[in-house]
């Protein structure tokens, strides 16, 4: 059941990403001349699909039966995220920002829908925006693709909740412009400090 769900999510992600790309709704962030630049995504990002493939990988290991709740999978997103480095290493996949991207989406894939309650605070939304950073749109796409219930009413409810989350994210983001925060340490400063030419390493040094 978990495997079939994963394949369905993977298929949903592939379809949704192609549609989003066609509408110019997704961006990729790259470093050019030491500066982070947002560019409209023009082709599918394979690592988003890897995130979809691995998002529930730890469910079997965290499966527990609760007399009141039935089967639960508490913490499967955290456990799954911890497994990602070893999985990538075993598959001889890159252990760089691509691995970290997949790890981030696996770890955060339950967070958006958890913001649905009326009691949710702006600070909780800010934390999600901060933790997801430039990958918030990919995370939301994955979260939406994860709605695969066979119950039409449940799907309608979850889709409605998801739209509410999107609205809350937009509202808080408009207030704080979190994703528009500019790191005071510029690419030029890093290049001068370390005596290096423009390259991807500059972005990594800025994060340090």
What is each PLM-predicted segment?
Residues 1, 101-104, 201-208:
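Short linear loop/turn motifs
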Residues 1-19:
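Long, charged alpha-helical interface segments
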Residues 3, 7, 133, 159, ...:
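Electropositive phosphate-/nucleotide-binding environments in soluble metabolic enzymes
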Residues 15-22, 59, 63:
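Conserved helix-loop functional segments at active or binding sites
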Residues 18-35:
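Helix-hairpin-helix/helix-loop-helix acidic hairpins
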Residues 32-153:
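Divalent metal-dependent catalytic cores for phosphoryl transfer on phosphate-bearing substrates
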Residues 84-90, 149-208:
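Charged substrate- and nucleic-acid-binding regions of tRNA-handling and nucleotidyl-transfer enzymes
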